């Protein structure tokens, strides 16, 4: 990912799942660490506005959150937590109903806050909330890349399809990347992807790309108990090696060559009303 002056593109990846329990936050955290391990400057945005998870998963205690930035009480750099591997973390603005309910002044302040740090950043990983509510749609719609996490539960495929359908029909999104998580074999991961593509190919005009599989690994549970990322706590585990492989794929994804790739434009899209596309 090349530097391009003061307005270099930032790869924005929204990690989502359509339901809870698919391991989405674990994927976000460990993907961020694996990308940092490749030499990328990574920021992780905890976008679960109702239930902050990233800081809990890593045993971090935020003194301030994005809500303080939105309200003008501090700068974005004041809320950043330093995670493992040099990953910077923006704690969730818990209690904030939606990013679309901002005043024009808050809107402008948020765009400025992110533009101030974009020179020192290559990748922004966004850990979204579960479900298909306005908050999730806002973050996913604003990102350049959508990484959809699925697992071997019947509701996982159903909910992933519901999210794809909503984003496709209401917001014109046509490209999604899919990661199978907690799979008991590589074939199980491929089968999950096949199930999802079977329904999307039949009913929607979208393109799904299979990113890979993270195997079921007891090391992940042990790391969670330690409040550490598995990539850091057990670097030679099956899950960590899989995250490394996924990060190498992600690192090869093309950067947007137009202004859409600049961080300010991500925030601009984020604070647009999801139903109308107009800023509020």
UniProtKB/Swiss-Prot annotation:
Effect of loss of the gene: Deletion results in up-regulation of flagellar genes that code for structural and regulatory proteins, leading to the multi-flagellated phenotype, which shows motility defect.
Annotated Pfam families: ParA
Chain residues that bind ATP: 19-26, 153, 181, 215-217, 221
UniProt-listed Gene3D superfamilies: P-loop containing nucleotide triphosphate hydrolases
Keyword ATP-binding assigned: yes
GO CC annotations, alphabetized: cytoplasmic side of plasma membrane; cytosol
Activation and inhibition: ATP-binding allows dimerization and subsequent antagonistic effect against FleQ.
Protein's UniProt keywords contain ATP-binding: yes
Keywords per UniProt: ATP-binding, Nucleotide-binding
Superkingdom: Bacteria
Assembly and oligomerization: Forms homodimers. Interacts with FleQ.
Family stated for the protein in its record: Belongs to the ParA family.
Function: ATPase that plays an important role in maintaining flagellar number in Pseudomonas aeruginosa. Exhibits anti-activator activity against FleQ, the global transcriptional regulator of flagellar genes.
Name the record gives this protein: Antiactivator FleN
Organism: Pseudomonas aeruginosa (strain ATCC 15692 / DSM 22644 / CIP 104116 / JCM 14847 / LMG 12228 / 1C / PRS 101 / PAO1)
Gene that this polypeptide is encoded by: fleN
């Amino acid at each position: 990912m090349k530097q391009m002056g003061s307005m270099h593109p930032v790869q924005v990846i929204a990690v989502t799942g359509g339901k809870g329990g698919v391991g989405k936050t674990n994927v976000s955290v460990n993907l961020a660490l694996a990308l940092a391990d490749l030499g990328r400057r990574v920021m992780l945005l905890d976008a679960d506005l109702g239930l902050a998870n990233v800081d809990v998963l890593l045993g971090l205690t935020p003194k301030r959150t994005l809500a303080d930035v939105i309200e003008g009480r501090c700068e974005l750099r004041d809320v950043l937590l330093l995670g493992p591997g040099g990953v910077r973390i923006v704690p969730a603005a818990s209690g904030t109903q939606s990013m679309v309910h901002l005043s024009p002044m808050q809107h402008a302040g948020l765009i400025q806050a992110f533009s101030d740090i974009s020179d020192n950043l290559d990748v922004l990983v966004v850990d979204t909330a579960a479900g298909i509510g306005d908050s999730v749609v806002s973050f996913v719609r604003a990102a350049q890349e959508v990484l959809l996490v699925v697992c071997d539960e019947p509701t996982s495929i159903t909910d992933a399809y519901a999210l794809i359908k909503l984003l496709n029909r209401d917001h014109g999104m046509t490209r999604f990347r899919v990661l199978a998580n907690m799979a008991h074999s590589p074939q199980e991961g491929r089968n999950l992807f096949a199930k999802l593509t079977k329904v999307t190919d039949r009913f929607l005009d979208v393109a799904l790309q299979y990113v890979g599989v993270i195997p079921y690994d007891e090391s992940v549970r042990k790391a969670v108990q330690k409040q550490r990322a598995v990539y850091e706590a057990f670097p030679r585990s099956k899950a960590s090696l899989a995250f490394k492989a996924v990060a190498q794929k992600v690192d090869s994804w093309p950067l947007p060559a137009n202004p859409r790739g600049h961080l300010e434009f991500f925030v601009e899209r984020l604070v647009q009303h999801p139903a109308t596309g107009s800023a509020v």
